[in-house]
Amino acid sequence: DSTSYIGVKNTLGIALLEGFNKYAKAGLTAFISHKLSNYRLMDRDSVSVDKYSEHEVFVGGELAKRQGKTLHYRAMGEVGILDKAIGQFRVNADLDLNFRLWKDTVSFIARGSISNTLPAFYMRHYHSKYFYWDNDNMEKEFRTRLEGELNIEHWQTNLKAGVENIKNYTYFNQQATPEQKSGSLQVLSASLNQDFKLGIFHLDNEVTWQKSSDQTVLPLPDLSLYHNFYMQFKLAKKV
């Protein structure tokens, strides 16, 4: 079994940097991108080769404020206008607010995204000796996600929670072939990172909870734990 892929992507953009004049409170970027993807797959006779070529052209922009200490934000979006990219789009944004709480620094981060994209090429086409599929009728995956994050610097605490909705989720079924779920799938998640330090001893901890609305299509462990205990010290000065 063999397959090959060659991809070339070019992006042309123009940017107005944040602060280029006194009225520019944020940076602004516009761009256009073209991606050419060439795939070679074996045919059913295992001798000849099937060739696939896909073009994607997107236009998009970004609005971002990165300067300053209190408030930062970024929003970026792109939409497909030619060939395989038609009907596809991606929009994502994030915002972080930093403020003092007593003698500590607290950061609140909010993230959101929405996208409508084709499943990966090898989910749509794959040829081998034991598995062979051409799924030309697959629908685009529509995803929306919201996430919030809280960081407390002095306590070395990070708390994160998010929710995601996926329509036409693409997965491998029990026959190890790609399939799309009809309707929507929801995923809830929350995680806590808490680090401790006592002299040269360090203990990093992460607890993650997650829940899928369809465990058959997207099985997820309810709880996962990570712990890392180590010592950190200097062997020599000025080294």
Give residue spans per PLM region.
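Exposed, low-structure sequence patches enriched in small/polar residues
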Residues: D1-V239
